[in-house]
Amino acid sequence: MLCPPMALGPFLAAPVPRPPPSASEKKRICRNLFNNAPGDSNIDQLLAQEQHTQRLYVKERYGYDIQLESNRDADANTDADADTDAHCQVLRGMRYPTSRTISSTDADECNPKAVSQAPRGMALTPAQISASAKLILQKCPESDRKKSNGSADLANCTRHGQKPYARQPQGLKGMYNVRKTVNGISKPNVKNGYNNNNNSSSSNNNSNMNINNKIVDNGTSELADQKQ
């Protein structure tokens, strides 16, 4: 079911910027703010007069001159800034800027961080780079070069299709890794026990064979009777 149409009021007009206040309004505003005559319209002058009257009132009532104290503070700040500049001139090579320029040599002697740098933007040519590399290689001893070659060969070699410093293969390949044997019974003890067992078993076998031979050769067999 459709809703009934809503009754909309008249549309509001577009906002128009407020016109500047008239001269009479300015006078009324000034009169309300500063309680002055309608003819005075200079705001800056009115503010200066108000500050002057308030300063005189404070000086008469409390004996404290605001303007004089502010001038003293300004002079003290100026003197402190001058002392700071003089102190900075004595201590060369400081991080803070000073009024006097410092030569680069003096700054380098006082401040280890201040290093006189060469003009930037200079690029080396390929010939210069190769020449400097040759000089470095000539200065290196033979042992250092051998070590570097060995490290390069080690870095280039592969194992299981990977670098030697890479992760070891997992899964089936990881099952075939050589494991440490568990230390069990020592070998000499095992050998002695095995030999003792063999000796005892051989002695038992020999005794049994001797007994059997005696039983066979005692002359009671039927074959011996038939021969007789």
From Swiss-Prot:
Phenotype of gene-disrupted mutants: Flies exhibit disruption of the formation of commissural pathways and shows delays the completion of longitudinal pathfinding. The disruption in commissure formation is accompanied by reduced axon-glial contact, such that extending axons grow on other axons and form a tightly fasciculated bundle that arches over the midline.
Which sequence ranges are listed under topological domain Cytoplasmic? Answer: 1-120
- Where is the sequence biased in composition, kind Polar residues? 218-228
Please indicate which superkingdom the organism of origin belongs to: Eukaryota
Give tissue specificity per the record.
Expressed by a subset of glial cells found at the midline of the embryo stage 12 nervous system. Expression is highest during the formation of the embryonic axonal commissures, a process requiring midline glial cell function (at protein level).
| Segments passing through the bilayer | 121-137
Report any one BP term from Gene Ontology: nervous system development
A GO molecular function annotation here is: carbohydrate binding
Q: Membrane topology type, per the record?
A: Single-pass type II membrane protein
Q: Where is this region: Disordered?
A: 141-228
Instruction: Please give the residue ranges for the topological domain Extracellular.
Output: 138-228
Q: Which GO terms describe its cellular component?
A: membrane; nucleoplasm; plasma membrane
Q: List the disulfide bonds.
A: none
Compartments reported by the entry: Membrane
Which sites carry carbohydrate?
149, 156, 198-199, 205, 218
Statement: the UniProt record of this protein carries the keyword Transmembrane helix: yes
Q: Where is the composition biased (Low complexity)?
A: 195-213
Q: What does this protein do?
A: Has a role in intercellular carbohydrate-mediated cell adhesion.
The name on file for this protein is Gliolectin
Species name: Drosophila melanogaster
Q: What is the lineage of its organism?
A: Eukaryota, Metazoa, Ecdysozoa, Arthropoda, Hexapoda
